[in-house]
């Protein structure tokens, strides 16, 4: 049976056409999104997700209706999960500014879509085999006031993910406009050197990941720019995101990272308890 999704508070069948050709997210990528892990009737990092979502809407000057609140979205997600009969799921909220052109003077009414997909419980476990990554070199992510947002215009990340698929990498690292590493196509990056954990600061253009925020609040992680040379000299490398938790990296290009001690410890002590 096809799954259901929600558009502006109403349930629809999976293949229902509800988005106008004038939708500004379709035309210009004018919107933001959240990807959330649902596990055993809860979303453990929901507060971080809703803060990031509504913070982005405010930052991008969306005209958000008073009824469109975090509690309203939370209840819709739970209702959709129930209707789709899911226990473990990936949830996506997509917000768009409305319909119209770039120069329209009429007020724009934001809209939203909520989707869910089943996900295996094992997907949150620490990976047995280390990831093999490459560096996407055909594009750069700008360092600006918007670079930390999860916007719907994800061109550099799209191309990086395509490169990873073509090269048979598990993921691709994205460079910023200073030729330093910002993050990966789908995750934040960390490296370990001399028993200290580092991650690029938001001023280096990574996405402001919720798992990143969680770990930064739990642990003495140093925020520091990451050059390709520093990455090659790291003792350990790992990635995090809200859906997969933490994954250790075995190779970036031809550079090996044979240890997963830090990633395994973080998984055991901090990430696994979130979803127990």
Regions found by a protein language model. Name each.
Residues 77, 83-95:
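Ordered, amphipathic secondary-structure segments that act as subunit-interaction surfaces
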């Amino acid at each position: 049976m096809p799954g259901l999704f929600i558009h502006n508070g109403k349930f629809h069948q999976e293949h229902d056409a509800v988005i106008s050709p004038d939708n500004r997210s379709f035309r210009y990528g004018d919107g933001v999104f959240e990807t959330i892990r649902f596990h055993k009737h809860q979303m453990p990092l929901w507060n971080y997700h809703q803060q990031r979502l509504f913070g982005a809407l405010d930052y991008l000057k969306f005209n958000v209706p008073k009824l469109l609140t975090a509690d309203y979205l939370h209840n819709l997600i739970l209702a959709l999960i129930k209707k789709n009969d899911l226990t473990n799921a990936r949830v996506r909220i997509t917000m768009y500014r409305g319909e119209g052109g770039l120069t329209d003077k009429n007020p724009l009414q934001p809209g939203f879509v909520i989707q869910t997909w089943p996900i295996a419980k094992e997907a949150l476990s620490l990976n047995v085999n280390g990831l093999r990554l490459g560096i996407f070199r055909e594009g750069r992510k700008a360092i600006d006031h918007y670079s930390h947002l999860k916007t719907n215009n994800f061109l550099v990340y799209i191309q990086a993910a395509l490169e990873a698929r073509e090269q048979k990498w598990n993921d691709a690292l994205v460079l910023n406009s200073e030729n330093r590493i910002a993050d990966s196509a789908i995750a934040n990056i960390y490296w370990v050197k001399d028993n200290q954990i580092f991650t690029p600061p938001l001023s280096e253009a990574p996405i402001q990941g919720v798992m990143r925020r969680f770990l930064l609040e739990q642990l003495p992680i140093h925020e520091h720019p990451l050059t390709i040379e520093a990455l090659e000299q790291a003792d350990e490398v790992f990635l995090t995101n809200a859906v997969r938790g933490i994954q250790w990296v075995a190779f970036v290009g031809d550079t090996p990272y044979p240890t997963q001690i830090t990633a395994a410890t973080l998984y055991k002590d901090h990430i696994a308890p979130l979803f127990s």
